[in-house]
Amino acid sequence: MEPRLPIGAQPLACLHMVAGLEMKGPLREPCVLTLARRNGQYELIIQLHGKEQHVQDIIPINSHFRCVQEAEETLLIDIASNSGCKIRVQGDWTRERHFEIPDEERCLKFLSEVLAAQEAQSQLLVPEQKDSSNWYQKLDTKDKPAYSGLLGFEDNFSSMNLDKKMNTQNPPTGIHREPPPPPSSNRMLPREKEALNKEQPKVTNTMRKLFAPNSQSGQREGLIKHILAKREKEYVNIQSFRFFVGTWNVNGQSPDSSLEPWLNCDPNPPDIYCIGFQELDLSTEAFFYFESVKEQEWAMAVERGLPSKAKYKKVQLVRLVGMMLLVFAKKDQCQYIRDIATETVGTGIMGKMGNKGGVAMRFVFHNTTFCIVNSHLAAHVEEFERRNQDYKDICARMSFSVPNQTLPQVNIMKHDVVIWLGDLNYRLCMPDANEVKSLINKNELQKLLKFDQLNIQRTQKKAFVDFNEGEIKFIPTYKYDSKTDRWDSSGKCRVPAWCDRILWRGINVNQLHYRSHMELKTSDHKPVSALFHIGVKVVDERRYRKVFEDIVRIMDRMENDFLPSLDLSRREFMFENVKFRQLQKEKFQISNNGQVPCHFSFIPKLNDTQYCKPWLRAEPFEGYLEPNETIDISLDVYVSKDSVTILNSGEDKIEDILVLHLDRGKDYFLTISGNYLPSCFGTSLEALCRMKRPIREVPVTKLIDLEEDSFLEKEKSLLQMVPLDEGTSERPLQVPKEIWLLVDHLFKYACHQEDLFQTPGMQEELQQIIDCLDTSIPETIPGSNHSVAEALLIFLEALPEPVICYELYQRCLDSAHDPRICKQVISQLPRCHRNVFRYLMAFLRELLKFSDYNNVSTNMIATLFTSLLLRPPPNLMARQTPSDRQRAIQFLLVFLLGSEED
């Protein structure tokens, strides 16, 4: 709709338009607000919305112009999906006018456009003033420049940048980023977290702009929320809602029957559905985050299986490989669900294979916080300790960033109600399947449950501490012959077990039913469900408003009389002998010794985008303290693949200064220092080939020299290389001794190892292997075959330049269709890279000869090693498409399927 201008008016450009109502006392007149530009001058045009449009008023946008959003009176309570907002407008010589815009999102967009226009107008008139006194400031994250590879070859790559050695394949972003927590730094890519239902409840105008005229509105709002939470009992009522929770391992099958016997088995439709699947897709591609058609198949099957008596809407979906979690709610309850966030954690080998791990969703329903976790833990009877570790890893690594809020990330346990479902894979400590089946036939389930590993581990407080589980009155849900009710009749003859479980923690949770559903026979597992009555905190608006106003009055009075103050127990921290992938913690306390509540946060230093270096993390990094309240803060140092290279090369040190900022108060400075022990992990192949001794025995100055020498100079004359031993001049090793030691061990001892490169190693053993390679040239490698295999993968992933150099990445993709060209490309690699590639291919071809024993397939090996050997350059990582990945896999298959002569 274009505004109609008076006759003789100069042409203008209509930039933005929004319809609303002008408030004149009790009257509401329809109108249209238009942001326009004429001859370089921005204007706000107010038009009547009658039968004939005409200009009622034109207000110049200049330094005296004001257009602000009004704060609402009902604050921080239930979120409506689109509540509208009110604005005030005043020009140079015009009275203040009030408008109501029904569509909140359009209103906020219009306000931002007007603000941008006003800023643009002011910049035309007044030079920009820079505040030199603001020494510390929070800056937006900027994309760091992409560095070209370290290594080159021949004359085609003379323009390479050989100076930068930082492994930037996963650069951290944002000041709220979490450094990779131990034991693994895997984080699911945004594509895998993408929700199918994008119509989320909106955050209201009020929650974003609590006190519009106040320059510190965000800080004040946070404090108010903090105190409101403390006084929650004064304004909430407990109301019961019905939650249906279901879990099913579908063994890679597609739905072949209705899910109503599982999802629609109660006379009264539940208010909320939480449905978890495991082994949704068992294809190799799915293991490495490719799209899965099974996701859509099962999501549609769930929707068709929901009760027809009620209307449901999908709240969110999250998937990691074969684990999928869906949450549905009755349509009339969706408006009370807000602050939705999802997260995934893979506990498979290196996090590359997300076949095990967990997916989770958190949300606020009315005023109660929920976290729903769907997990698939490690398999095999004897691996109960690995299952315990998987559970701990998920708890430690899974944290949620709440959308549209600047609050710290919240972990699983920081919710009012946690529901944990899935194929937890805990078995029975009874080896005789016939004895177990006999007890089942006699319905002596309680005798069997005494041997249930999950019950034993919970009793010993080694896993799922503080969780509850309902009484199990159904027979084991694993393992059956698919499409039948018969126990496993295969050669393995699995012992029946209650693998599929539902647990919970929190108050006001009452389980009504806990059952299996034998009618569904698609999989070798049977689905399980639980029905809960959960007491939810519902806000009483009248009492809420009274508490809110009381808090505001108290804060107004105290803010005028007192300034915040903190006391720190320590300000200097020393981290000694920091190692790759080995966590170190130092703790200290901060106390609010002032008279008012305060908000603290670690903030970036000048010109920084993060409050600390990538290898450091403060937990929590921000929060609120009431007078006389004390909190423990942990400073964690963890060197991951993203920071190991620059620490190895001496470009970075274990040194940092943290700025702890107190709102309305002063800044406190924390000094971080320490020493780092270099590792062969994260060191370039060229440097390692020239080291005849373990890296810890090489002087630091020599390490720096080795990393700074360019490959082009080394290729010109091998005899002119900097020797490690004084007075000698030796050719480099054909391949790094570390790679040879790992591969040789696997070749000798692991060719028959079941599920090699598919089962993660133990973290303690991985650390022993890393230390062993850094400090010695061992005759044997410590640890299990699985740990040695994962150590090899970690080594390849940590290389600053992959085995196939970044410069050849695109050429490899382009030549994937022609084996002859593929071999030509490999011949152009630098010598040590070429040798390593051929050595690894020879080993993998040998490994594939024993696939009947080790369950290693060509496609699985190609997919796994492609992600390590043929990585896209950092600047192309985010733009890599499924087609690119498939071509990269095809390139590697040329060598895996080729002859030994290749």
From Swiss-Prot:
Chain span(s) of sequence motif Clathrin box 1 = 76-80
Entry-linked InterPro entries: Endo/exonu/phosph_ase_sf, Ig-like_fold, IP5, IPPc, OCRL-1_2_ASH, OCRL1/INPP5B_INPP5c, OCRL1_PH, OCRL_clath-bd
Q: Which reaction does it catalyse?
A: a 1,2-diacyl-sn-glycero-3-phospho-(1D-myo-inositol-4,5-bisphosphate) + H2O = a 1,2-diacyl-sn-glycero-3-phospho-(1D-myo-inositol 4-phosphate) + phosphate; a 1,2-diacyl-sn-glycero-3-phospho-(1D-myo-inositol-3,4,5-trisphosphate) + H2O = a 1,2-diacyl-sn-glycero-3-phospho-(1D-myo-inositol-3,4-bisphosphate) + phosphate; 1D-myo-inositol 1,3,4,5-tetrakisphosphate + H2O = 1D-myo-inositol 1,3,4-trisphosphate + phosphate; 1D-myo-inositol 1,4,5-trisphosphate + H2O = 1D-myo-inositol 1,4-bisphosphate + phosphate
* UniProt xrefs under CDD domains: INPP5c_INPP5B (cd09093), PH_OCRL1 (cd13382), RhoGAP_OCRL1 (cd04380)
Q: How would you summarize where this protein is expressed among tissues? A: Detected in brain oligodendrocytes (at protein level). Detected in brain oligodendrocytes.
**Superkingdom per UniProt:** Eukaryota
* Ranges for region 5-phosphatase: 238-564
Keywords from UniProt, A to Z, are:
Cell projection, Cilium, Cilium biogenesis/degradation, Coated pit, Cytoplasmic vesicle, Endosome, Golgi apparatus, Hydrolase, Lipid metabolism, Membrane
Q: What quaternary structure, including any partners, is listed in this protein's UniProt entry?
A: Interacts with APPL1, PHETA1/SES1 and PHETA2/SES2; APPL1-binding and PHETA1-binding are mutually exclusive. Interacts with clathrin heavy chain. Interacts with several Rab GTPases (in their GTP-bound forms), at least RAB1B, RAB5A, RAB6A, RAB8A, RAB31 and RAB35; these interactions may play a dual role in targeting OCRL to the specific membranes and stimulating the phosphatase activity. Interaction with RAB8A modulates OCRL recruitment to cilia. Interacts with INPP5F.
* Family note: Belongs to the inositol 1,4,5-trisphosphate 5-phosphatase type II family.
The task this protein performs is described as:
Catalyzes the hydrolysis of the 5-position phosphate of phosphatidylinositol 4,5-bisphosphate (PtdIns(4,5)P2) and phosphatidylinositol-3,4,5-bisphosphate (PtdIns(3,4,5)P3), with the greatest catalytic activity towards PtdIns(4,5)P2. Able also to hydrolyze the 5-phosphate of inositol 1,4,5-trisphosphate and of inositol 1,3,4,5-tetrakisphosphate. Regulates traffic in the endosomal pathway by regulating the specific pool of phosphatidylinositol 4,5-bisphosphate that is associated with endosomes. Involved in primary cilia assembly.
Q: What is this protein called?
A: Inositol polyphosphate 5-phosphatase OCRL
